[in-house]
Structures are given as structure tokens and as C-alpha cells.
Amino acid sequence: RLVTRYDSPSETSNRGAYKTLLIQIGPDVAPSIIGILKGRSFFENRENFDILVRVKNPRVARLMLPFLEDEEVASQVVEAIGRLGSGAVNATIEALDQMKEKESNIPVMENIIKILGELKGPRAVESLESLSQHSSERIRDAVDRALFQIRGY
């Protein structure tokens, strides 16, 4: 409900106050904020992503990862999780490890790998290396890029 008010065109003059309040509430607002990303450009969503990033809580990454399945917002979710920094590494590794256990959605797996590369978390190397022989060329290429970003070679 608060997110609806924050997003309402009639509340533009109070938007700053709503934004501050949403940041103070914390990770619980993430699913609602992610829900309003659809159909908007990254530019239009910059304030929404700023809220998600400023919450700076590993829970936000966990809450955002399922939205990688929605092609409409996936690239924006990749960008936002990448901005969360090291706090998002463990949740992202766990998501990748869960996907490896079953034959999964290749674009989603590719985005998770891309996030790990952007986060540059050395803890991800082992999980990524285990995918270096994956049957999908897209996954192998994403793994190579991510490992290069993490290691620098």
C-alpha cells in the first residue's frame, strides 16, 4: 500500500518522503518495489532501484533473484543486484547452485552468472568453474566472462 502511494502520480510532491520511509522499512518492501518495475525503462525505474540498493541487505538479493524469470525486468534486476555489492554474493551463489541441480532456464542461469561476475566475489569461483563444461554454449561463455571479471585474467 505504501509503495502504491509512493508510485502514485498524485503523490509526486511527497515522493522523497515516501522513498525515505521505504528505505527505513527495509527489505520487506523489495517485492512490492520490484512489482512496479514492469513496463518501465531503467531510467524510469532509477528511483526504485535506488531504494532497493540503499536497503543494503542480503535479503534484498534473495527477494530479487526470482524476478530474473520475468524477461521484462530481468536486465534491471541484474543491474540492481550487481549494485548491492558483496552482500549479494552468497544469495546469488546459492541460487546458481540450486539451478545446477536441475535442468534449468538457460537465460536465468546466464543472468545469475552475469551477476556473479559483476559482484566479483572470489567465493563464486568454485560454483562457476563447475559450469565451465556445461552443455550450453551461452552458459560456458557467461562463465568465462564472469571468471575473467573476478580473477582479472
Regions found by a protein language model. Give the residues of each.
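Structural detector for internal amphipathic alpha-helices that build alpha-solenoid repeat scaffolds
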Residues: T4-P27, S32-N57, R62-E69, A74-G87, ...
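TPR/TPR-like (Sel1-like) alpha-helical repeat modules
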Residues: E129-S135
